[in-house]
Regions:
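Short strand-loop junctions, especially beta-strand C-caps/beta-turns
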Residues: 36, 94-96
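N-terminal catalytic cores of peptidoglycan-degrading enzymes
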Residues: 1-85, 145
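Basic/polar, cationic surfaces and motifs that engage anionic cell-wall
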Residues: 1-25, 96-162
Length: 162
């Protein structure tokens, strides 16, 4: 992220499909975390979402590089729940399978946590708190997403988001 105060990501590669312009009267009230179940780059996410009816606002790569895919003023299709989509920012994280478990790299975990903190500050959501203003995708849809972010790496992730 190039500027935490203004939420400027390292790169911008905006989707031209599979999101909704505006927020249908909603405003950003919380953050929804996701994992790629793959080691995708910003460009890789962009490519996948050209044919898959899904999107997210932000992608965090394995090396910590951040990318904006949908503007915050618009609705990404990420939570499987329209209210959640129109009232949140969706943040995707690259990860890898290690011993049959999806795991974030150190750089992804650190960058993701700092992006969450920056979003909470910018949108005046309060201190990042799990299940208060930071939610797993699985809270809104039947899914194991965001894997380790809601499991083995949750405490470290949320600690770094402070």
């Amino acid at each position: 992220m190039t500027n935490y105060d203004t939420l400027d990501m390292d790169t911008v590669k905006l989707l031209n499909t599979h999101y909704t312009k505006g927020r249908d009267g909603g405003s950003i009230q919380f953050i929804v975390l996701h994992h790629n179940a793959s080691n995708l780059t910003v460009e890789g996410c962009w490519q996948v979402w050209q044919s898959r009816q899904a999107s997210a606002h932000i992608q965090i790569e394995e090396n910590g590089r951040t990318g904006q895919l949908v503007w915050d003023a618009d609705t990404a299709w990420h939570a499987g729940n329209w209210y959640a989509n129109t009232h949140s920012v969706g943040i995707e994280h690259a990860d890898k399978l290690v011993n049959d478990q999806w795991v974030l790299s150190e750089a992804t975990l650190d960058a993701g946590a700092h992006v969450v903190a920056a979003y909470c500050k910018y949108y005046k959501l309060g201190k990042p708190e799990w299940m208060k203003n930071v939610f797993p995708h699985s809270h809104f849809s039947a899914t194991a997403c965001p894997a380790s972010i809601q499991g083995s790496q949750n405490a470290e992730y949320m600690s770094r988001a402070q």
